[in-house]
Swiss-Prot record:
Biological process annotations from GO: carbohydrate derivative transport; phosphoenolpyruvate-dependent sugar phosphotransferase system
Cited Pfam families: PTS_EIIC
Source organism per UniProt: Geobacillus stearothermophilus
Topological category with respect to the lipid bilayer: Multi-pass membrane protein
TM stretches of this protein: 31-51, 72-92, 104-124, 138-158, 187-207, 227-247, 250-270, 293-313, 347-367, 407-427
Subcellular location: Cell membrane
Domain observations: The EIIC type-3 domain forms the PTS system translocation channel and contains the specific substrate-binding site.
One CC-aspect GO term: plasma membrane
Name this protein carries in UniProt: PTS system cellobiose-specific EIIC component
């Protein structure tokens, strides 16, 4: 085990640290976070629209008219269906901030580049016709929503890189010092912005002469579909949680690092479920693996599913340190925040506790996937329930009001308890012995590894 810890320190930590500091991945992560408040707001309307109450639809139709649901879901389209637009602006804005250039201009240019790369065509089936035709001039909702995420992120990075290089080479229009700063910044962005749009425009013209026809089609074939297959599989989920837990074991924020790469895929899969659920709440949903799958069923109490460990320390610990830590950690743990345990127990770089910390999420992925894939438990409906929502409540809301989602969370809690308990008992015995040998040891969680 000591050799394993040294391997983590010598090989994993340096690589993971560089990935964590990679500015493009940080910009993608922060840009996606910008869209989350909108998705949560839209999800609230979804929840209200599909409350699992007998007679609810009839009662709402009586009071608000036959088309009450269509009107209620207007905000869903105004939040979920502009996801790519928000991410396009957000990624470029955050990346420009890291380069210390005008972020607002970079975001606006990225947004323009994304719209330039997007064909303004929508499918339409005339009355009585059997074939669908493409009509020009309409806003293509499918591409400005989750399906356009990859194009939005790629163009945000490319456009910002072009923008900042031209700025840094000082190929800009400079105005006299007396001009207001806002006006001066807008003129500084003229040449870089024009360069970005010309590049995207020429690329679009070239693609239109190929079988791919557009940026969205080529990215869908080369990136979106293969990554969605990988990210949406149980194998991909296991690899992802293994990486998350290994990184956390070295003290690095595993969820942020892995999420920067996989987050767009899981978010897109989540929205696929949302679109099906919105059309028919009782329909078979296409995906088990989504962002909510990890946030609400795997990381119960935070990465490593440590809520069970916090309760165990609170009620079963003989060590004063661990009992005090359990009392401290239980409140944030209920809201899936577990840094007090991860760094206070500690789990980080602890040869004994790293074992269950890595093992528990892997087991929960297998159990949860099997339960949902076989139909025993409802799949995530695409409702963006905040990751800080306590278990039972979150499982019920995230499955569109299915009690099976809450039951699976409870089952996962007890699975985590069963795996953690033997390792906790050994650690607790060691800490209690240390306290008995040295009564001056403080009641705070110790950091000495006894193995």
């Amino acid at each position: 085990m000591d050799r394993f810890i040294r391997m983590l320190e010598d090989r994993v930590m340096p690589v993971a640290g560089k990935i964590a500091e990679q500015r493009h991945l940080q910009a993608i992560r922060d840009g996606i976070i910008l869209s989350m408040p909108l998705l949560i707001i839209g999800s609230l309307f979804l929840i209200v629209g599909f409350l699992p109450i007998p007679g609810y639809n009839e009662w709402m139709a009586k009071w608000f008219g036959e088309h009450w649901l269509d009107k209620l879901l207007y905000p869903v389209g105004a939040t979920f269906d502009i996801m790519a637009l928000v991410v396009s602006f957000g990624v470029a804005y955050r990346l420009a901030e890291k380069y210390k250039v005008d972020a607002l201009s970079a975001g606006a240019i990225s947004l323009a580049a994304f719209l330039l790369a997007t064909p303004y065509q929508v499918p339409f089936t005339p009355e009585g016709a059997k074939e669908t035709i493409m009509v020009s001039g309409g806003i293509p909702v499918q591409w400005v929503g989750s399906k356009g995420l990859f194009v939005a992120m790629i163009l945000a990075i490319v456009s910002t890189e072009i923008y900042r290089k031209i700025i840094q080479k000082n190929i800009v229009i400079k105005l006299p010092d007396g001009v207001p700063p806002a006006v001066a910044r807008s003129f500084v962005a003229l040449i870089p912005g024009a360069a970005v749009l010309v590049v995207v425009w020429v690329a679009r013209l070239i693609l239109e002469m190929t079988p791919f026809e557009s940026f969205h089609n080529i990215v869908s074939v080369l990136l979106n579909k293969p990554l969605s297959v990988l990210g949406g599989s149980v194998f991909g989920a296991i690899v992802a949680v293994l990486l998350v837990q290994l990184l956390w074991s070295t003290g690095l924020h595993g969820a942020a690092i892995v999420g920067g790469v996989m987050g767009p895929i899981w978010l897109s899969l989540m929205d696929e479920n949302r679109m099906v659920f919105q059309q028919n709440p009782n329909a078979e949903l296409p995906n088990v693996i989504t962002q909510q799958f990890f946030d609400l069923w795997i990381y119960i109490g935070g990465s490593g599913a440590t809520l069970a460990l916090a309760l165990t320390m609170m009620f079963r610990a003989r060590s004063r340190q661990l009992k005090s830590l359990g009392r401290l950690a239980i409140a944030p743990g209920i809201f899936n925040i577990n840094e007090p345990i991860t760094f206070g127990m500690p789990i980080v770089m602890n040869p004994l506790l790293i074992i269950p910390f890595i093992l528990v999420p892997v087991v929960l992925v297998v159990v949860s996937y099997a339960a949902m894939a076989t139909g025993l438990v409802a799949k995530p409906s695409g409702v963006a329930v905040p990751w800080t929502t306590p278990i039972v409540i979150s499982g019920y809301l995230a499955t569109g009001g299915k009690i099976s989602g809450s039951i699976l969370q409870i089952v996962n809690f007890f699975i985590a308890f069963a795996i953690y308990y033997p390792f906790f008992s050994i650690w607790d015995k060691q800490k209690a012995a240390e306290e008995q040998a040295d009564p001056t040891i403080s009641s705070g969680a110790g950091a000495t590894h006894s193995l």
